A protein has these predicted regions:
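Alpha-helical transmembrane bundle of multi-pass membrane proteins
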Residues: 2-246, 253-256, 262-515
Length: 515
């Protein structure tokens, strides 16, 4: 797998990635900067694009409490409860799979709008559902909308962000997921005292509001410059880059780099193989990208974070809390912790790097999950056991939020080359959603078989395997452009856990083979 050739006759099939820049560098144009408002503009775009992520977070948070009242109002069974909770993650894979093709066809921006409209429809149906069957129909639609949203937001943000700030900005969707979870917990507590046939409907209906704001926000934000280059709309792409990058010289260099990566100078080179064929029959470099991207997405979920968040009332009830109001109050503490530590990650991700934070996250989660298993197994139904269980749950979500939570979205959106980015990110999102759905749809059944404490021992073992995966399969990508990261995966040595290998801007002179 490699970048496209320049397409000049008589040239070798090996090309310097920076060969298209040389003439521009010799012009010695005076450099202009337009830093006034640039950072604020990029920040605003990242925030608006992340509003779809609030939908997923809100659903996770609100369903943990709403399900208590849905069970009472609609008289659903435990199996129906598991299906209702977990089906959204499973069905969202349809949106994630379709999201790659859709975003390449209509653009990143309008794919986000499409996602918001589908979710609004589903949320409206859930709010008015008179039966379990109608509730499931609404949940299926909401899941498809969320699948589109969680796939496209990180891609869009990565493609408009300057390299130096991309890590922090691309983690915004995870921040907004956490914010949505907290809003869901607060909504549960705030409306829990309404009549049982009304409270859960209000809880679910409030989730429509973020998607309404997103539709208005799309009037403001621009299309992705990389998508515009793929559509041969170079002038528009440059206009967007001028708004998001401070240096005019860097704008010219970045535009040339994007054109080269997109195969704009010789577009027929990338028509030789369909994108999905390349993903399903990958070269060694693409295979490494898929292992890293899809692997980190799956580990994010199979370490049990959604079980902790969706079923936190069940966990706290097993620890000894009895009343619904106390259960929902304890979940607010979990939501606050999760949101606080995701903000910590934003400040560290481009300073410390991706890999050190992943080590901290996975090792910390392993410790907390093991501690929670011990507490629920041997100290349940005691005042000290309740406090300790809350401590371990909050610790687990804190370590998750400081590393594995945001960084998996950052890595998935930045490691794939432009021509594969949308579809590969969709595959990563599919892995995440399927894993999440399986965990959510089996947690109660597994807990009944091996106890809640035993289930968290299993999660602790899986989390320890995530530490090994980070060491073996995740390279450091801090400070590299999206196009430079592609080169990083061409080197087997650099991919296999060597943090000291840095790809500088000048390293684009490395030779890349065209397949």
């Amino acid at each position: 797998m490699g970048l496209a050739e320049n397409g000049k006759s008589g040239q070798s099939k090996y090309e310097r990635m920076d060969s298209d820049f040389v003439e521009g560098e010799n012009l010695h144009l005076p450099e202009k900067t337009n830093n006034k408002g640039t950072r604020k503009y990029v920040l605003a775009c990242a925030i608006f694009a992340s509003l779809n992520s609030v939908l997923l977070g809100y659903d996770v948070g609100v369903m943990s409490g709403a399900i208590i009242f849905i069970k009472e109002d609609l008289n659903i069974t435990e199996v129906q409860e598991e299906v209702l909770v977990g089906i959204l993650s499973i069905i969202s894979l349809l949106g994630s799979l379709a999201g790659g093709k859709t975003s390449d066809a209509i653009g990143r921006k309008w794919t986000m709008a499409f996602a918001a409209i589908i979710f609004q429809t589903g949320a409206g149906i859930m709010t008015l559902a008179p039966s379990f069957t109608i509730l499931m129909v609404g949940r299926l639609l909401a899941g498809i909308g969320i699948g589109f949203g969680v796939m496209i937001a990180p891609v869009y943000i990565a493609e408009i962000s300057p390299s130096i700030e991309r890590g922090a900005l691309t983690s915004f969707p995870e921040i907004f997921i956490n914010f949505g979870i907290l809003l869901g917990y607060v909504s549960n507590y705030a409306f829990s005292r309404l009549p049982v046939h009304v409270n859960w409907r209000v809880m679910l209906g409030v989730g429509i509001l973020p998607s309404v704001f997103l539709i208005f926000a799309l009037i403001i934000i621009p299309e992705s410059p990389r998508w515009l280059v793929m559509q041969n709309r170079i002038v528009e792409a440059k206009s967007v880059l001028l708004k998001t990058i401070e240096s005019e010289r860097e704008v010219e260099e970045r535009l040339a780099e994007i054109q080269l990566a997109a195969g704009h100078s010789n577009s027929e080179n990338h028509e030789e193989r369909a994108v999905w064929q390349e993903l399903l029959s990958p070269s060694p470099g693409v295979k490494r990208m898929l292992i890293t991207g899809c692997g980190i997405q799956c580990f994010q979920q199979i370490t049990g974070i959604d079980a902790t968040v969706y079923y936190s009332p069940t966990i706290f009830r097993d620890a000894g809390i009895k009343s619904n109001s106390e259960l929902l109050g304890a979940t607010i503490g979990v939501g606050c912790t999760k949101t606080l530590f995701i903000l910590v990650a934003i400040f560290l991700i481009d300073r410390v790097g991706r890999k050190p934070l992943l080590y901290l996250s996975t090792i910390g989660m392993t410790t907390c999950l093991f501690g929670l298993g011990l507490t629920l197994s041997f100290m349940g139904n005691s005042p000290f056991g309740v406090k300790l269980a809350i401590f371990w749950v909050c610790g687990n979500v804190a370590f998750f939020s400081v590393g594995l939570g945001p960084i998996n979205w950052v890595l998935t959106s930045e490691i794939f080359p432009l021509r594969l980015r949308a579809q590969a990110s969709a595959l990563g999102a599919v892995g995440s959603r399927v894993s999440s759905g399986v965990i959510a749809m089996t947690f109660l059944s597994v807990s009944r078989a091996i106890t809640v404490g035993g289930t968290f021992f299993v999660f602790a073992v899986i989390s320890s395997l995530a530490v090994v995966f980070v060491y073996k399969c995740v390279p450091e990508t801090k400070g590299k452009s999206l196009e430079q990261i592609e080169m990083l995966f061409q080197s087997d040595g650099q991919w296999r856990g060597r943090q000291g290998d840095e790809v500088e801007l000048g390293d684009t002179e490395n030779l890349v083979q065209k397949e």
